[in-house]
């Protein structure tokens, strides 16, 4: 029996995720895409995965560059997430209006992020209408001051109350 794609998507939406922007530079141009299909894979070696739509511009760039960054967005970076997920997706220069630096791997690092992983392409696996890129983490940074992450749940951005903790 075939799964209804909309029902499947809505079910997956009941799993809260952080929001990331995956950035890549192929030596000539930089691109980015919003992604919440991100996960850690292994501590030794340090591996992560990101899932990229087969139609995404970043797909071939990651394959060719063999490197990418994963920027963990802070709560106040909703507009950046929207930019890379929406109208900015097709912009000629996605980074012209944004504050960023180039990482040690010559790939964009968004200013204000709460965490960063610089990765070398370790492997790729087909995954239906997506490609699963596995990255070997070569550099990891995080914001020392705990700041609220940008969350996504039930098709909407959400906030985290950092003062609310389980006993």
Regions found by a protein language model. Give the residues of each.
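Basic, polyanion-binding surface patches
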Residues: 1-167
């Amino acid at each position: 029996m075939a799964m209804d794609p909309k029902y499947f998507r809505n079910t997956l939406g009941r799993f809260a995720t952080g929001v990331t922007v995956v950035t890549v530079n192929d030596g000539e141009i930089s691109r980015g895409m919003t992604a919440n299909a991100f996960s850690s894979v292994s501590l030794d070696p340090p591996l992560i995965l990101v899932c990229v739509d087969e139609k995404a511009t970043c797909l071939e760039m990651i394959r060719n560059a063999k490197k990418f960054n994963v920027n963990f967005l802070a709560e106040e970076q909703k507009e950046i997430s929207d930019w890379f997920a929406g109208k900015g997706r097709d912009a000629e220069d996605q980074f012209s209006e944004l504050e960023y630096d180039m990482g040690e791997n010559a790939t964009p690092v968004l200013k204000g992020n709460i965490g960063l992983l610089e990765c070398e392409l370790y492997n790729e696996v087909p995954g239906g209408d997506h490609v699963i890129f596995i990255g070997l983490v070569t550099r990891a940074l995080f914001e020392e001051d705990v700041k609220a992450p940008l969350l996504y749940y039930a098709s909407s951005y959400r906030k985290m109350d950092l003062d609310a903790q389980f006993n």
